[in-house]
Amino acid sequence: IGGKVWYVEGDERARKLTYKDDLKLLNIEPPSSDIFCGNGFDVHAFCEGDYLNLAGVKVPFNKAFKAHSDGDVAIHALCDAILGAAGAPDIGQLFPDTDMKFKGIDSKILLERSVEFVRSIGFEIINVDITIICEKPKISPYKDEMAKTIASVMGINRFRVNIITKLFEKSVVRPAFSVIER
């Protein structure tokens, strides 16, 4: 390398770490590997309207979701997943539809409050993965805007938010298990 080399006498107290087992000499606790994962699910019936609120984005459609809030099924499921991972009550308990202060509320506010709550009790949200099962309207053109909206509300990097869209594809479970159906 071009520099001078010196010989330095070692000291018994200066432990050298050569092998993986030598790390035991440091006597430190390993980092926690506790990762908590939540799962959320939500459905709403349709009513008269001209758009659906999905993941914080107004998607043009010939109907709307019937709900006490704005009916955003994606955000409601996400809130339940976040709260569930922390062992907290679900959004129905924290933001009940019997409380008029939540009538017509923007679901992004519910998400913001859910995130604030889990952070206040010591949790960190690493990433979110949202699956929207929907025949119509077509959701794919809105996925990036949805991910940006969710990331902004949650205060996390956009690339830590994943939006997946799925179809039933004429599955036999469709009549018994519908999330969004025309």
What kind of feature is each model-predicted range?
Residues 59-69, 97-102, 168-170:
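A short glycine/serine-rich beta->alpha loop
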Residues 129-138, 143-171:
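Short, conserved loop-to-beta-strand elements that form functional interface hotspots
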Residues 43-58, 154-160:
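Acidic-glycine-rich active-site phosphate/pyrophosphate-binding loop
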Residues 171-182:
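C-terminal edge-of-domain segments
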Residues 81-124, 135:
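Glycine- and Gly-Pro-enriched alpha-helical subdomains that act as flexible
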Residues 1-35:
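Conserved alpha/beta core of the MobA/IspD/sugar-nucleotide pyrophosphorylase nucleotidyltransferase superfamily
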